[in-house]
Amino acid sequence: MHLDAHTDVFTKVELFLGAKTSAAHWGAYLADQGQVDPTRSMQIRLRGHARTLDWLQPSYDYGYNVVTMKEFRSRGLADVVAQTRTVIGDRPVYITFDLDCLDPTIAPGVSNI
């Protein structure tokens, strides 16, 4: 379960300063390595990425179950929790929680440099 404002599945965004890997790419790396099954994974509260207009497409291409912030607000917590329980089932869960998934009015000091 991935709680974040960004997908972290970027495959076409260049790495920074010549880095070999990046925190913006880990979802793609793990799926490519078979370490994560995107069809059994949730990405929740995604809000966007300023570098590309098709920011959700890599997640969809990999098969991740995506709930954007807009969708989260529309559907409500109970419905998203129900979907998450269905998708994950009784399998072990790893939760990655990036503070930028919180609304900026709640966590105004959080940024992504």
Provide a role label for each language-model segment.
Residues 1-113:
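Conserved alpha-helical scaffold segments that buttress catalytic/binding sites
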